[in-house]
């Protein structure tokens, strides 16, 4: 997971990795970022969500107009860079340790094991690490955007 996420208003977020026939390491992060039910919906459907929905879910900190994205991001980065370095490091480490205490590291290890199993399965079936039709499915989904129209 990222420390701070700033998105433009026109950004869309999706995770169509299931179309590849395997899981990715991102599987472990979604429940932490957006909750279990939304994580399952995003992974099972591959449907995109808007930047505002991502913000409402806690996946994004700020949503700004595309024309303001660089300026907003640089202002925030400059503000953070002016903070006492040791205090920033301690704050980040504290939050990261809290996540570790809640099981994020264990989740990552489990996701990696499942990812290896998925790739091995696809190699046995298709002699490739991913579902052969997956790329086309993902391209089709990307063209559709955040319409939430299921086929």
Task: Report the location of each language-model feature.
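Crotonase-fold acyl-CoA enzyme core
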Residues: 1-88
